[in-house]
């Protein structure tokens, strides 16, 4: 019962399935990663995001 909603990378539609029913793409979890103040790699992730 614990299904999570997913968002397709190709078409951007939301689904509960493992494969997008519209385009056949692979959906991913649209939720961001959980925040932790003790994140050892947070500094590098923010630097990569800035470019």
Curated annotation (Swiss-Prot):
NCBIfam families: PRK13130.1. Pfam families: Nop10p (PF04135). It comes from Methanosarcina barkeri (strain Fusaro / DSM 804). One of its GO terms (biological process) is rRNA processing. The keyword Iron does not apply. Belongs to the NOP10 family. InterPro entries: H/ACA_rnp_Nop10, H/ACA_rnp_Nop10_sf, Nop10_arc-typ. One of its GO terms (cellular component) is ribonucleoprotein complex. Involved in ribosome biogenesis; more specifically in 18S rRNA pseudouridylation and in cleavage of pre-rRNA. HAMAP family: Nop10. Keywords: Ribonucleoprotein, Ribosome biogenesis, rRNA processing. Gene3D superfamilies: H/ACA ribonucleoprotein complex, subunit Nop10. This is Ribosome biogenesis protein Nop10. GO terms for molecular function: snoRNA binding. It comes from the Archaea. SUPFAM superfamilies: Nop10-like SnoRNP. The lineage of its organism: Archaea, Methanobacteriati, Methanobacteriota, Stenosarchaea group, Methanomicrobia.
């Amino acid at each position: 019962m614990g299904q999570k909603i997913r968002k397709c990378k190709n078409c951007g539609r939301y689904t509960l399935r493992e494969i997008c029913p519209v385009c056949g793409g692979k959906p991913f979890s649209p939720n961001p990663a959980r925040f932790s103040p003790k994140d050892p790699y947070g500094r590098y992730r923010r630097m990569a995001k800035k470019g």
